[in-house]
A protein has these predicted regions:
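NAD(P)+-binding Rossmann beta1-loop-alpha1 motif at the extreme N-terminus of oxidoreductases
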Residues: 1-52, 121
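Intrinsic-disorder/low-complexity, polar/charged segments
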Residues: 12, 95-98, 245
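Rossmann-like NAD(P)(H) cofactor-binding subdomain of soluble oxidoreductases
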Residues: 62-175, 183-186
C-alpha cells in the first residue's frame, strides 16, 4: 500500500526519498523556494556509489516508481500524510513557517521518523531516568518540540553521508558514504507496520544497468532497541565533539587519549 510521506528538508531528505520512492510512495519535500521549483520541474537526482563499479549510479526521481512534489512549509495540510520524516538540521526547525508546521505536526499525532544528527528531544524522552529538562539547553529552541508525543517519534542513525556537490544545481545530491539507516521502532505496532513496509520496499529496490539489475546500498533497517540509532554517539562524544578546544583544533586520536578515563566514562 503506497503511503503519503512528508519530509522536512530536501538536502539529506532527497537521499531518504530516493529509496522510499521505489515502493511507489508519494513524497512531499518541504524546502526552500529555489529547491522546490527545481524539484517540481526536474525532480531530484542522487548519485550513489556502488561497490565494484567505477562510477556511481544516478537515481533520478522522475524515473522511479513513486511520485515527488516540493514546496514551502507554509500551507502544508498535515492531515494528508501517513508519516513525517524529519530531515533538517536541528536549528532549522525554529525558522518562521517551519516552526508553525512542526506545531501542526505534533498536534496532529502523526508518527515522525527522524534522520537528524541531533536526536529529537521527544525521542530522548522515551529513555526512562533521564533529566529531560537539563537536555533542553542542547537544543537551539526546545519549545519547538513541545507539541510532540514521545511515543510517536522515532530515530534513524544518520550513518549515510551525502553532500551537495559544489557548482551543481540544488536538486543534485552526492552520496559519499552509502551505509544504512538504522531505525528504532515506535511504541505503537500500527506505526511499526509502516516502518517494516518501507524497510521491505527499500530492500527490494533494484537498479537497471547494462549488465542487468543490481542491488542498491543504503537500506532502512528497523530495530527493536532504542539505543541502536545512538550507536555513534559514544564515538562523537569521546572524539569528534572534543576536537575543538579553547586553544584550537586537535585530531580525534588526541581528543580521545588526552584524558582516557574521561573518554571511557
Amino acid at each position: 500500500m503506497p503511503y503519503k510521506i512528508l519530509l522536512l528538508g530536501a538536502s539529506y531528505g532527497s537521499l531518504l526519498a530516493s529509496k522510499l520512492l521505489y515502493g511507489g510512495h508519494h513524497i512531499h519535500l518541504v524546502c526552500l523556494p529555489e529547491e522546490a521549483k527545481l524539484i517540481n520541474t526536474e525532480g531530484f537526482k542522487v548519485r550513489l556509489p556502488i561497490r565494484g563499479r567505477a562510477e556511481p549510479v544516478l537515481l533520478d526521481s522522475q524515473r522511479l516508481p513513486g511520485s515527488v512534489s516540493a514546496g514551502p512549509a507554509e500551507g502544508v495540510d498535515v492531515k494528508q500524510f501517513d508519516l513525517v520524516g524529519l530531515c533538517m538540521q536541528e536549528p532549522q526547525y525554529r525558522s518562521p513557517g517551519v516552526r508553525e508546521l512542526m506545531k501542526a505536526i505534533g498536534e496532529s499525532g502523526l508518527p515522525c521518523m527522524s534522520i537528524m544528527n541531533m536526536p529529537p528531544l521527544p525521542y530522548m524522552k522515551r529513555f526512562p531516568g533521564l533529566d529531560y529538562k537539563s537536555l533542553e539547553a542542547a537544543y537551539t529552541d526546545a519549545r519547538v518540540w513541545d507539541a510532540f508525543d514521545p511515543n510517536k517519534v522515532t530515530l534513524n542513525s544518520p550513518d549515510p553521508q551525502a553532500i551537495r556537490p559544489p557548482g551543481e544545481p540544488a536538486n543534485v545530491l552526492q552520496v559519499t558514504l552509502p551505509t544504512n539507516f538504522k531505525c528504532a521502532t515506535f511504541v505503537d505496532e500500527k506505526y511499526n507496520q509502516i516502518l517494516r513496509q518501507l524497510e521491505t520496499d527499500v530492500a527490494n529496490a533494484r537498479f537497471d544497468t547494462p549488465e542487468g539489475k543490481i542491488e542498491l546500498p543504503v537500506k532502512l533497517k528497523v530495530h527493536e532497541s532504542l539505543f541502536v540509532p545512538l550507536a555513534k554517539w559514544a564515538m562523537l562524544l569521546a572524539g569528534n565533539y572534543r576536537c575543538v578546544t579553547t586553544d584550537g583544533m586537535r585530531n580525534t586520536q588526541d581528543a580521545v587519549h588526552a584524558d582516557i578515563e574521561q573518554s571511557r566514562s
